[in-house]
């Protein structure tokens, strides 16, 4: 927000900049949380000025609260409609539209299953989209709502997923899986050194709150 100057909003801008977005994430050193992953991606790509597309869910909230984006038209997200399946096609479109900035798709294991066959488009046209899957084994935002507003009466939020690494590789796309904090940065280095599409699956906790 430092690049925008709206005097009548100065108090609110200061409030946002000073606000601590750390929520109860049930964080433990041995557990990988989505917020930690998002912050790591943001820090790594700060000088790359990426275009960031998100799907819909907890990862989307984590991106909005923790990913540093200081330029217009750099965040593509379905905020009003909340349409799962929006982010990956949006990232592909951004890649087709321009090649100056890297394009990132941050998605969840639920949302990615809406449009994962589009991996074929990335491969066919060699679109270097970096897909980061936050896999918590659930529809996390719905689960959080059921926990907080429905007295933990969980219903249809735990989901099964394919092996995203093998699935990506079956399309001819390189992919790796990360389940430890120490492996986040090496995975990002590997993804961005690769000039082709690349998938990283982050295995995160299922009880995180954002």
Which sequence ranges carry the predicted segments?
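Thiamine diphosphate
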Residues: 1, 62-210
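Generic low-complexity, intrinsically disordered sequence content enriched
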Residues: 10-13, 20, 143, 192
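Glycine-rich, acidic loop regions that bind phosphate or pyrophosphate groups
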Residues: 1-11
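Active-site diphosphate/adenylate-binding microenvironment
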Residues: 13-89, 94
């Amino acid at each position: 927000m430092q690049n925008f100057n709206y005097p009548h909003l100065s108090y609110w801008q200061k409030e946002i900049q000073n606000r601590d977005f750390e929520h109860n994430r049930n964080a433990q050193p041995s557990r990988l949380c989505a917020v930690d992953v998002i912050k790591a991606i943001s820090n790594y790509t700060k000088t790359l000025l990426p275009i960031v597309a998100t799907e819909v869910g907890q990862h989307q909230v984590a991106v909005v609260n923790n990913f540093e984006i200081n330029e217009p038209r750099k965040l593509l997200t379905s905020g009003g409609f909340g349409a799962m399946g929006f982010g990956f096609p949006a990232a592909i479109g951004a890649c087709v539209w321009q090649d100056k900035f890297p394009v990132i798709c941050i998605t969840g294991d639920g949302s990615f299953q809406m449009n994962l066959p589009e991996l074929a488009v990335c491969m066919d046209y060699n679109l270097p989209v970096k897909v980061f899957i936050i896999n918590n084994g659930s529809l996390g935002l719905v689960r959080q709502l059921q926990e907080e507003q429905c007295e933990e009466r969980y219903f249809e939020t735990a989901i099964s997923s394919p092996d995203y690494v093998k699935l990506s590789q079956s399309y001819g796309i390189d992919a790796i899986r990360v389940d430890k904090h120490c492996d986040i940065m090496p995975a990002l280095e590997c993804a961005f050194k690769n000039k082709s599409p690349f998938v990283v699956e982050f295995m995160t906790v299922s009880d995180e709150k954002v």
